[in-house]
Structure formats: C-alpha cells, structure tokens
A protein has these predicted regions:
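Oligomerization/assembly interface segments of phage tail-like spikes and tubes
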Residues: 60-85, 156-171
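Beta-rich interaction/scaffold domains
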Residues: 191-227
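Short helix-loop boundary/capping segments
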Residues: 93-142
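Charged, amphipathic alpha-helical segments
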Residues: 2-4, 80-110, 191-206
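Beta-strand elements of well-folded, non-transmembrane domains
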Residues: 77-81, 122-128, 140-145, 167-171, ...
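Mixed-charge, glycine-accented linear interaction segment located at domain edges/termini
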Residues: 137-190
Length: 227
C-alpha cells in the first residue's frame, strides 16, 4: 500500500540531532561533523516565512507576489546537552581531573562567541498508518535566539531549555529543508566514514616511566565524518 501523504500526523517526536557544518562551498556539497543528540526533545517547530507584495490599482488588488524568504525553527528540550551547546553556540568543553576530582566546563568567551553553522534533523514516529516515520532536515542553520533555560527549586516543575534558529540554503545545491517520509522506520543517519580525528583535551597524565600502563582519564577525542 502506498503511503498516504494527505493526512500526515504530527506526534511522537523521538529524536533531534545537530551536526556542526565544516564546509559549504559553491563547488562541493556541505560536510558536517559527527551528529550530537539533543536529548529530551519535547518539540520541534518549523516556521517558513513569506515576503508578500500586493499590487494595487483602480482601487482594487490587481496582483500579489509571495516568496519564501526564511525558515525559522524552535526546539525545546527537557534536559541540557553541553555537547549540543558547543555545536549550536560555539564555545568549548574542557575536562580536568579524574574520578572524584573530575570537572567538566562549557565556556563561551569573547573569542568564540560567534555561533557556527549546523545541520539539524528531527524524527517523529506517529506520522500515519501507512508511514513508518517522518524526518525534517534543515541543512544550514544558525541560532537567532540562544538557548534559554530555567532552573526551578524543589517546589517547582522540572525546567526546560529552548532555542530558536534560522535556516538558509546551502551554496552548491541550494538544499534548504526537506520533509522525508519513510515506509519503514529509519534512525537519523550517522555518517560511517571517519575522515579525521583530533585530540581536544589531552589525558590528565602525559608523562610515564618505562613499563607504566597508559591512563586515559580526561582524554577527549573528536572525529569528523563524511556521509
């Protein structure tokens, strides 16, 4: 049976991931870093906007012109991902110490305060009786309203975190946004080809004597992937 595309349900958001954009040129398709999960997704709202022009004459409307000029989106989560903040806001995560003395810090400084470009993809499972799942993909985004989160005391409810961004077309192919329906459920794809690897934070212990066992506490390694 063919998928029914006339009555798409919008229920059961299951996954939202973001991937930092590495490159976007007029000669090649964009490349992205490995996806980061925005855990605890509550909602993913996509809002295309139109520029409208109306031609008047003889005391009446003679014509109208409309064109999609921007696509805005808002994501709300029940928990905060430091790795997600690093992708959408910039900044840097650093680790220090080990075991009980371990400390993890996300920091935004004046030098890294420009939000990077990223891709965002959301997946929901209840899309229709003949549809396995549905995905929304925005290929080149930048935050327009940074994450806003509230921490309540024990008498209140759990806080949440939300941010708003704007999507724009990629340079070579003009990919902007896609709504993808799958006959069978598919997870958000994670690129399988590792193209590079870098050490973001060295291990706590870097000097050894002959015969000592390596200790990797504190080591943070980041890989770049290609579709």
């Amino acid at each position: 049976m063919a998928m029914d595309i006339t009555a798409l349900r919008l229920m059961e958001l299951k996954d939202v991931k973001v991937s930092r954009m590495i490159s976007d040129s007029a000669d090649a398709e964009p490349t992205y870093d490995n996806p980061v999960d925005l855990a605890g997704a509550l909602s993913f709202q996509v809002s295309p906007e139109l520029e409208n022009k109306i031609l008047y004459g003889d005391s009446t409307i003679m014509d109208s012109y409309s064109r999609t000029t921007s696509i805005n989106f808002t994501v709300t989560n029940s928990v905060v991902s430091l790795a997600g903040l690093e992708v959408i806001m910039g900044g840097q995560i650093t680790r220090a110490g080990a075991k009980e003395a371990e400390t993890v810090i996300y920091e935004l400084t004046a030098k890294n305060a420009t939000p990077p470009y990223f891709k965002i993809e959301g997946k929901w499972d209840y899309a229709g009786e003949t549809i396995g799942d549905a995905h929304i993909v925005l290929y080149k985004c930048r935050v327009s309203e940074p994450p806003d989160f509230t921490v309540n005391d024990s008498s209140g409810d759990f806080g949440d975190c939300s941010f708003t961004g704007t999507a724009m077309p990629t340079r070579k192919s003009g990919h902007w946004w896609q709504l993808i329906l799958n006959k069978e459920e598919k997870e958000i794809e994670i690129p399988s080809e590792l193209t590079s690897i870098s050490v973001k934070t060295p291990p706590t212990k870097v000097t050894y004597s002959t015969g000592e066992t390596l200790e990797l506490d504190g080591l943070v390694v980041e890989g770049a992937y290609e579709d």
